[in-house]
């Protein structure tokens, strides 16, 4: 209920229940935010700031509006609703759909994936551990009626951990000649995606159900997602998952560094690892293919080059960055 009608409905229900039935009508009360316009003003026909939810549903879908309201339903604050917000969460639905298309394109089998194989590939261990951690967070937040935090947990894991990182990292394996690793990636990527649909179903039931039935996850195609039990995943976080975190950290820092210097994110660079510690140097050498692909690196050098370089610090290690010859470092710094 909204706080503005607590006395008119909630309080009276409690009074009537205790007076006539000698018991409270309910144990828990969830007081949600009021939905206002993007400036925080109360919606009014006279002000002309009323947003018709039916128009938003028609334009962006019921799931997009539903997920928007859930994500913004923080305790103690009103929802400042705008069309751009709903549009942003519609893009999230598109991201989910595109992830499904990626699995189809890479010939993933949607049947018989209730169990995952023994994990040998590091990125598979990492995403499975992230899934376990996210599941625990969502369960805790739902139990605490923090629907906004639960929605954000699901959003962050799906968009960033799974789509932005895991699927991108998996491409280096899917395009390799290692058939065993490719098969493991196919099975794990499909298994995790299946669990993502289960996690997201309370928030966006229509699109998740559509994908579930389309892929026939239950082997028959007639068992609805809404009938499935909640998932239980045990974390397997170890040194191998830490290695993946290290890769992500290095690539993220490289991208941020380019952005800070106003350099095109698509530009290629050379980096020198001459000044970093021995363990990190060995780690980078063993993960050179992935780092080059996602970091857009031409060469990873053991020695410094005799030309101007920008310096970047990652976890205490000093990297020297060499840009294309047409990039003027003096102009960048200005």
Language model segments and positions:
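Core structural elements
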Residues: 91-104, 122-134, 152-172, 312-317
């Amino acid at each position: 209920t909204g706080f503005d009608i607590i006395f008119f409905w909630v309080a009276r229900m409690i009074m009537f229940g205790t007076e006539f039935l000698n018991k409270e009508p309910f144990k828990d009360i969830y007081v949600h935010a009021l939905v206002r316009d993007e400036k925080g003003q109360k919606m009014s026909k006279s002000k002309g700031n009323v947003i018709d939810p039916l128009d938003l549903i028609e334009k962006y879908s019921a799931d997009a509006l539903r997920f928007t309201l859930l994500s913004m339903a923080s305790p103690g604050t009103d929802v400042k609703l705008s069309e751009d917000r709903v549009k942003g969460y519609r893009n999230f639905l598109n991201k989910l759909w595109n992830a499904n298309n990626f699995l189809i394109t890479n010939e993933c089998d949607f049947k018989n994936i209730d169990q995952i194989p023994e994990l040998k590939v590091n990125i598979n261990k990492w995403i499975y551990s992230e899934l376990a951690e996210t599941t625990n967070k969502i369960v805790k937040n739902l139990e605490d009626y923090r629907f906004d935090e639960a929605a954000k947990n699901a959003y962050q894991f799906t968009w960033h951990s799974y789509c932005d990182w895991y699927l991108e990292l998996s491409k280096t394996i899917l395009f390799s000649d290692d058939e065993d690793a490719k098969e493991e990636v196919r099975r794990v990527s499909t298994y995790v995606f299946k669990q993502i649909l289960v996690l997201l179903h309370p928030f966006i039931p229509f699109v998740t159900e559509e994908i579930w039935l389309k892929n026939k996850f239950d082997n028959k195609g007639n068992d609805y997602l809404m009938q499935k039990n909640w998932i239980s995943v045990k974390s397997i976080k170890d040194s191998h998952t830490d290695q993946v975190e290290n890769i992500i950290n290095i690539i993220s820092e490289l991208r941020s560094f380019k952005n800070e210097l106003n350099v095109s994110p698509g530009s290629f660079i050379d980096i020198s690892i001459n000044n970093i510690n021995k363990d990190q140097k060995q780690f980078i050498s063993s993960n050179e293919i992935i780092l080059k692909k996602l970091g857009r690196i031409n060469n990873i050098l053991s020695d410094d080059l005799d030309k101007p370089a920008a310096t970047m610090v990652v976890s205490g290690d000093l990297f020297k960055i060499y840009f294309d010859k047409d990039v003027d470092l003096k102009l960048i710094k200005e």
